[in-house]
Amino acid sequence: MQSNGIKRVLVTGANGQLGREMRRLGAASPNEYTFTDVAELDITDAGAVMSSVKAGGYDIILNCAAYTNVDRAEDDEAAAEKINCDAVRNLAEAAKQTGAVLFHISTDYVFGGDGNTPRREDMPLSPLGAYGRTKLHGEQAVEATGCRAVIVRTAWLYSEYGNNFLKTMLRLTAERPELNVVFDQVGSPTYAGDLAIALFTIIEGGLYEGREGVYHFSNEGVCSWYDFAVEIARAAGHDACVIHPCHSDEFPSKVKRPAYSVLDKSKIKQTFGLDIPHWRESMEYCIGRLKKAEQQ
């Protein structure tokens, strides 16, 4: 931290869903945020990462970068490992050497898909595919360096930006008279804007001091992908599209996805005093922002 109390924060993966929300929040902060994506900093290059972190004098590194294509990871696990593990290790080692605190975003995919109890941070980890394995390896790499770190697992992320389930459903329910959506996979959608606000609150307030560890964050409430799709269509006014529930085995996939992805958020709420909105409220807000952007 500088002598004037201003923190320096490095945000990687700044062009992704979460990174773009952090850009919006960081612009109004008295602290100094530096936003990078692969064009500015290749986090798979250990030397470049170390040089950049040392030169920037960062107090906090927030890693929003990830290889998130679950199916493609099955065909090229090495590529996913490079970004989800090796690059994370580079950031963690730089944080360790410089004394920075690393915030790293992980996933519900580190768990298996069985059971019907919300996942606590200390529950056994058993990823079902390559994506989950590489994300778990990333968590383990952070812990192995011994750096000060806050790991936040999230699930079903969506926003106004990039490609995600909400935007796909908005398009398909506008284009098609009917649609099949799986009902046998259950979780809690996470609006990237809400996750960004939570991270921003923790970072800006210095609430992470002495509270490093693993946390879970998603919006409140539970639904299936079918439920989510129905609510998206309702909120968007796409009532003409009939949405049918179907089994996940009707959509062949290279990797088995978790049937139950509900995360227990008790720890992050109690530790940092966070008030987390219900997924339906945030979904409607996101759709409202998309509609407003279309009108401009």
Describe these PLM feature segments.
Residues G205-K254, E294-Q295:
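Mid/C-terminal beta-alpha module of Rossmann-like enzyme folds, strongest
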Residues Q140-G187, A192-T201:
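NAD(P)-dependent short-chain dehydrogenase/reductase
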Residues T12, T36, I61-A65, L102-T107, ...:
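SDR active-site strand-loop-helix element
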Residues K82, A87-N90, Q97, V110-V152, ...:
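Catalytic helix-loop patch of NAD(P)-dependent Rossmann-fold dehydrogenases
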Residues K7-L25:
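N-terminal Rossmann NAD(P)H-binding glycine-rich loop of SDR-like oxidoreductase domains
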Residues A46-C85, A94-K96:
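NAD(P)H-binding glycine-rich loop region in Rossmannoid oxidoreductase-like domains
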Residues W279-Q296:
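Amphipathic terminal alpha-helices
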Residues S29-V49:
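Adenosine-cofactor binding site in Rossmann-like domains, unifying the SAM/SAH pocket
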